[in-house]
Amino acid sequence: MNLIKIIKKFLFIQNITASIVAKIPPYLEFTVGKYLAIKKALYITAHDKTFGSYIEFGIFTGSSFNFAMKANKSIDKLLGRSDCDFIGFDSFEGFGEVKSTDNHPRFKDDTFAVDEKKVIKNIKKNSKDQKYQIIKGFYNNTLLKKPSEYGIKKARVIMIDCDLKEASMLALNFVRDVLQKGTIILFDDYIFYKGDEKKGEYGAFEEFKAKNPSIKFRPAFEYGYGSKAFIVTEI
């Protein structure tokens, strides 16, 4: 029996599969995709011995930050200790003042404000022996400092989950001097704003590249629902 005949005979299996997949919440798929992307970035950088800090902008509930620490511990056992430290930035109060150019119906303070104490308590519980620090505050304050003031020497993996262009631009400018060949940057909301090239994380990245032509990037992989990763190839 050839493959086409098998497919025709067991059409009900396709129908069942389609029904199951259709009911999986998009947020669940998005989250799993994000986890796998972080794990992939940590593995690639460990494999190529690109050492430094894991930096996350927009930790929200801390789920991906916690996952990064767990994934790194697993990869360390496989490829050897990387001495990676983890730094997370978030206001825990939402976006604060949002420029009109960053307006989006889904990006509202009441959606992204979280209980800071609960988040930090959960991160502490999951950190085990991993080195980490959480920097609270709006980016227009916390990211005016130099990375060295937070103990950051080089960036290994950067997760930009800022949603807005202004916040993403502040994050990119902050890490400018700690980028190295092999650093992987993950843009978690790369495709939003209906693909507008001047808005959101995409717009911030395009502007950053234009202002820093000496830094070269190569697409690494895509993940989730319109998220994308890039690797620094020249600096």
Set out the residue ranges of the language-model regions.
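S-adenosylmethionine/decaboxylated-SAM
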Residues: 19-29, 48-235
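Membrane-proximal basic amphipathic "stem/tether" segments
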Residues: 1-31
